[in-house]
């Protein structure tokens, strides 16, 4: 059996994954005051992770520890893509609400983190324009140069 603290840790880890997925889009909005379609994959991943939290892993107080994943989660060649649901439209609406709640909560966390670290964000944007990609050491060095620390969320 999962203890409450273990369940909370697992939810926190998944929340962090979603916060990271949303970070690029939010940073783009903060830095350029505009958004592009570049973050479409990140948004898809964030949404899938939030939906999995609700439908597969039972991380929803509203719905409880019930698996609501559909049989179409794994699509095979030659099989039509559809959504055979084993739950009501009302439950589907609650699932959508829970997914939206998780995404919104993670969006707020990502926005807060990026605003609190705006100097680092601006330097990171400059560095990425120059190099396109950076490694973990370069990323962490940005925080050290600006007397910031990477804290646990």
What feature does the model see in each segment?
Residues 7-10, 14-153:
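Soluble catalytic regions of large protease machineries
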Residues 1-2:
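Short, exposed "boundary/linker" segments that immediately precede the start
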């Amino acid at each position: 059996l999962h203890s409450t603290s273990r369940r909370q840790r697992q939810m926190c880890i998944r929340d962090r994954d979603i916060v990271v997925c949303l970070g690029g889009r939010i940073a783009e909005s903060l830095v350029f005051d505009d958004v592009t379609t570049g973050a479409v994959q990140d948004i898809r991943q964030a949404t899938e992770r939030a939906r999995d939290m609700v439908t597969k892993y039972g991380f929803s107080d509203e719905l409880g520890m019930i698996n609501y994943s559909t049989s179409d989660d794994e699509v095979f060649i030659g099989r039509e893509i559809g959504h055979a649901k084993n739950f009501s439209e009302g439950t589907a609406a609650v699932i959508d609400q829970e997914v939206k709640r998780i995404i919104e909560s993670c969006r707020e966390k990502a926005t807060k983190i990026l605003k609190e670290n705006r100097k680092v964000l601006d330097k990171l944007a400059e560095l990425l324009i120059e190099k396109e990609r950076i490694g973990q050491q370069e990323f962490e060095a940005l925080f050290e140069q600006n007397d910031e620390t990477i804290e646990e969320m």
